[in-house]
Structure formats: C-alpha cells, structure tokens
C-alpha cells in the first residue's frame, strides 16, 4: 500500500532540511521526499509500507524534534477501459452473415492458474507418520514431489526453507531509485 506521511520537523536552515531529507530517503520503503508547509518545516514522505514510528525516531535522533502530522493512502489513478469498436458494431450487425463476430481475441484469455503443489509431511521420522508410509531409509520418501527421484536441497514443499513456502508477509519496496523533490 502506497502512502504519504507528513512529518513536522524543527528545521531552521537549509543544512538541517538537507540532512532531514537525506535521513528520510535512506529509510526502507521510501520512494520520494518533499519539503512542504508555509515555513518549510514539514517533510512529505511517499513510499510503500513505510514504517513511520522508526522514521520519526531516526529524525528525532539525527536531525531535530519531529512529530507525525498525517498519514494518507495514495490511490492509484483509475484507467478508463476503452472498448474497441463499441460504436461500429451496431451498424455492422445489420449487414448480413458474420462468422465469429463475438469471438474473444487472444488478448481476452486469462492465463491458466498454477497447479497446487502437494504438501508432504516434514520431516518423515516420528511426528505421527504411519510406519506403512513408503520410504527408503533415513525418512526419505521413495518418490520426490519434483518427480526426479533424486533428493534435492529442498525435497519437501512444506519445508520451512522451500521456495514454494510463502508465508504471505508484506513485501517492502527495495527500489534504490529514490528521488528528492
């Protein structure tokens, strides 16, 4: 979620303003910093998933007293969908046989959904796994989920370090392309 954070910082000269902007841009998730306010004593920080409390604490510690003024969510601009040939279909419909007039183009197809990966128990020793479970020593199953028959570094999709095991934590914007306005 992209957000704008407005912070009032006690800044009296340009050197302090530059220092405050530098500290804000170095913070994780920040994409833009701008000086606002009548007295040029406010900083507007724009970014994705910016944690504002540590940002304010760093500004207080490194620059001067800072306080949170407001936090607003940035709405992405809505794009208007234009229908191709929407006006011309009525006039062409009266003119005789049309084959495939309502067919969907290749752009209208949705990509197929990925198949779910089966989740095998990890590890296989103990933890209530029945003894009739097929295995070949040391708790390694005879057939691996990848289907290659050779143990890999992550043989189980439920392994905590398996690449398919996404726990859904927020993703922070790690773009180094920050700009100071």
From Swiss-Prot:
Coiled coil ranges: none
Domain of life per record: Eukaryota
InterPro entries assigned: HIPP46, HMA_dom
Keywords associated with the record: Lipoprotein, Metal-binding, Methylation, Prenylation
Propeptide residues, chain positions: 179-181
Residue segments, region Disordered: 74-121
Signal peptide (from-to): none
Domain HMA: 2-71
Molecular function GO labels: metal ion binding
Lipidation (S-farnesyl cysteine): 178
Residue numbers bearing the Cysteine methyl ester modification: 178
Disulphide linkage map: none
Compositional bias annotation for Basic and acidic residues: 75-113
Family to which this protein belongs: Belongs to the HIPP family.
Role summary: Probable heavy-metal-binding protein.
Protein name, per record: Heavy metal-associated isoprenylated plant protein 46
